[in-house]
């Protein structure tokens, strides 16, 4: 996950996407592609903020989870490598969620939702991620009697804290995946609802005759 190319790939990718949005504006006269990009970047930035806050909490709970479990020995004394890892993971996960919502709202036979209607669904994904993190963190703590010895044998001094942090990370991913699936289903259902209530086109004069 610690990709040194990210520092130049992300800006270049951003410029390319903006250029595509401007070209689409010139060709169609609308900002539909730009609004879709707004959803993507909003999801990515939101996920990065969540990941940074989440990892700050789990790092405070168990530095060993990062220094041993994630293979970041410098994380034992510094949050910097943890923050870098969080931003990378958040960027990728956020783009994936945003892309799923944009595709679910892609034009077709169904009516399209305005992009602003997707914002609550992004919030729903975050809520599911938080719920998953809390639930799995509790399960991690409860698993100490079963897994604590094995974790300690790996050199971990505080197995319970390690398992709590590990559970929180697994739960965040599971919760976000479930939340994204629910949100995609909700977007599709909302589009069907709009389509069913869309007035049918009036028949032309030739059809009436």
Annotate each language-model stretch with its function.
Residues 49-61, 131-147:
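C-terminal TM-helix exit segments that contain a strictly Trp-centered aromatic cap at the helix terminus
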Residues 192-209:
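Short, highly charged, low-complexity non-transmembrane loops/tails of multi-pass membrane proteins
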Residues 1-17:
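Hydrophobic transmembrane alpha-helical segments in integral membrane proteins
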Residues 26-46, 116-129, 181, 185-186:
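Alpha-helical transmembrane segments and their helix-start/interface "positive-inside/aromatic belt" motifs
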Residues 17-25, 91-109, 172-196:
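Transmembrane alpha-helical segments in integral membrane proteins
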Residues 8, 79-95, 157-181:
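Hydrophobic alpha-helical transmembrane segments
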Residues 72-74, 147-165:
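Short, membrane-exposed interhelical loops at transmembrane-helix boundaries
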Residues 64-79:
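Perimembrane loop-to-helix junctions flanking transmembrane segments
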């Amino acid at each position: 996950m610690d990709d040194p190319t990210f520092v130049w790939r992300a800006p270049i990718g951003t410029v390319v996407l903006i250029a595509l949005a401007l070209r689409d504006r010139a060709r169609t006269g609308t900002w539909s592609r730009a609004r879709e990009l707004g959803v993507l970047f909003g999801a990515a930035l939101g996920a990065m903020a969540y990941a940074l806050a989440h990892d700050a909490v789990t790092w405070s709970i168990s530095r060993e989870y990062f220094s041993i479990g994630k293979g970041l020995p410098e994380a034992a004394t510094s949050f910097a490598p943890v923050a870098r890892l969080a931003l990378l993971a958040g960027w990728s996960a956020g783009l994936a969620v945003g892309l799923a919502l944009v595709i679910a709202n892609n034009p077709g036979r169904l009516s399209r939702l305005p992009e602003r209607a997707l914002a609550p669904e992004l919030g729903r994904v975050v809520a599911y991620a938080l719920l998953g993190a809390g639930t799995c963190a509790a399960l991690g703590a409860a698993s100490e009697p079963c897994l604590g010895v094995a974790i300690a044998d790996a050199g971990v001094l505080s197995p319970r804290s390690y398992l709590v942090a590990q559970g929180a990370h697994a739960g965040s991913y599971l919760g976000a995946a479930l939340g994204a699936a629910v949100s995609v289903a909700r977007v599709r259902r909302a589009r069907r609802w709009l389509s069913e209530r869309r007035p049918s086109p009036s028949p032309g004069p030739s059809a009436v005759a």
